[in-house]
UniProtKB/Swiss-Prot annotation:
GO molecular function: ATP binding; proton-transporting ATP synthase activity, rotational mechanism; proton-transporting ATPase activity, rotational mechanism
GO biological process, one term: proton transmembrane transport
Catalytic activity: ATP + H2O + 4 H(+)(in) = ADP + phosphate + 5 H(+)(out)
Residues annotated to bind ATP: G231, P232, F233, G234, S235, G236, K237, T238
One Pfam short name: ATP-synt_ab
HAMAP family xref list: ATP_synth_A_arch
Superkingdom classification of source: Bacteria
Protein's UniProt name: V-type ATP synthase alpha chain
Amino acid sequence: MKTGRVLKISGPLVVAEGMEEANIYDVVKVGEKRLIGEIIEMREDRASIQVYEETAGLAPGDPVITTGEPLSVELGPGLIEAMFDGIQRPLNAIKAKAGDFITKGVEVHSLDRDKKWHFTPVKKVGDTVEAGDVIGIVQETSIVEHKIMVPYGIKGTIETIEEGDFTVVDTVAKVKDKDKVSDLMMMQKWPVRRGRPYGRKLNPAQPMITGQRVIDTFFPVTKGGTACVPGPFGSGKTVVQHQLAKWADAQIVVYIGCGERGNEMTDVLNEFPELKDPKTGEPLMKRTVLIANTSNMPVAAREASIYTGITIGEYFRDMGYSIALMADSTSRWAEALREMSGRLEEMPGDEGYPAYLGSRAAEFYERAGNVVSIGSEEREGALTVIGAVSPPGGDLSEPVTQATLRIVKVFWGLDAQLAYRRHFPAINWLNSYSLYIEKISPWMDENVASDWTALRIKAMSLLQEEASLEEIVRLVGIDALSEKDRLKLEVAKSLREDYLQQNAFHEVDTYASLGKQYKMLKLVLFFYDEAQRALNAGVYLKELLDLEVRDKIARAKYISEENIENIDAIFNELSEVIDQLISKGGIMNA
């Protein structure tokens, strides 16, 4: 391949000449240290190259060699439990080769070429296969069965296939189509900027259970859905993302740390091996892929890290798994776009972001979905994408937030005021929304309880009434309210503090199953119904608010999943206490 020459260097942007044989999005090696870059613009024989490593030390005249291939990821056994940088270089392998700091031009394979995996065929010689068909399985971790699929573009009859221990580049099967014989390895490559093909998209109808009460009850996201978590600094975006990565009922989690602080990735690395998956009892790390592209790594690689992560997510989706992808934070990705756009001297849009910010964000989020995979056997997989957005100063009218809100169906708006009041997760129930509620309400009513939707609507209306009553209280004081309105305020407070508030660092409260959420919500609303009955019978509000059973309602969140029937005892106690108050006839008649 012909070698070009560096003409100009501007931070992560390098312009090279003599590149007439190259194509846009080709990967190139720049300079004597062979820095990895990607062509993002071609003008005659000049190529504008986005370099994914530090460009200090490059000089005009340095060689630029094109590989003739687009930026691709290696897909195969070895992805789970691994930690990659933004362009899928394994950080453990880099540390072994170059020490604690990533040196320029270091080259390592994304997947280990020496490790052997036990391949068990599920097809036999003579079977006809096509792209997407599963030919064998590898038990990658104790909970992830890695399915080896026929790569896109290959079909035919299996000539040879054998069981045994192989590396990812060994031939495990041969497929013959007419006169052409294709060798199948356990590894395949896929360009990151192109979505992997699928048979057809399905309407998402099943919720992704997260164990976070405010999300599952009020603003659920479906498997295959899209959601965003915008919020100012310190409002808890990363903790929400960590909670979702820990407890979401997805089979695989892909966590992309895009331009955020390194200690947040350290938290994940420290916590996930210790925490147990509630369904399998195995460490959470055994179902997780980490992509660490922290704030002290080159800016340009942030742009690639988002695509690297979603391509890995699509690969596992094609196996028929449910995937949850967390991107923290898409604002840093947008800032990388803005920096490259500025250096390319493109016409700026709002706040300096490129005019194509909205279309790039849409390209990313539309790769989510609930799909039927390609292949002769139907497999249904789901890829759920949850992106954090970090608007400066919490201003939700800024371009990245607005571009994201036009695309995603769920908005979990984090509120600085709630965070300052130590209400976590600080998701504002008055601003947030989910457009999936109507689709998943039938599933909830069928699988959790027939009155789930009714309880949810009742609780939300109480919280909304509280907001309007608080305005009256601020103007004329609480004494202007009737006892029934004051009861509403108390029940709404109970909903906020005893139900919506959740401690991510408490061993019991960090996760609540749907069954427990239903009983807790019903308990708070049962108190409201019983208290209304008592008020109508002449009982005074103060007596109701002083009941000891209210402490038990507040502590219901700390009842473990094994002892969930203890909540039923609180229902019975509450009924008895209210009946006693009514029979006594109120404080004046006592």
